[in-house]
């Protein structure tokens, strides 16, 4: 799995992102750091040291379309493919295959539910 992550100004400089609380913005950054090469994170428990890892901040990210939450508790960074391209020789496919089967990548490079 790649160890570097990118954050795109095209995503984080949108008014809808800047209108989020500071806690939700910080949580988004932590989620990006913890995500696998396809943008999946094993829920909030994956980032226990982040003081902003609250259900309230997560709900803000979900309702704003920045994170997708699955029934399993797994999270997905909706704009992952817009921000991160992992070299083929460093890419490790996600272990969350059931969740990945529930989304597709739209024309603008964002994950959407099927």
Task: Identify what each model region corresponds to.
Residues 1-11, 16, 51-114:
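Winged-helix/helix-turn-helix nucleic-acid-interaction surface
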Residues 2-38:
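Short, amphipathic alpha-helical interface elements at domain boundaries
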Residues 22-26, 42, 53-57:
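Short, well-structured alpha-helical interface segments that form or flank functional binding sites
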Residues 32, 42, 89-92:
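Surface-exposed beta-strand edges and their flanking turn/coil or helix-capping segments
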Residues 35-52:
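Short acidic, hydrophobic short linear motifs in intrinsically disordered regions
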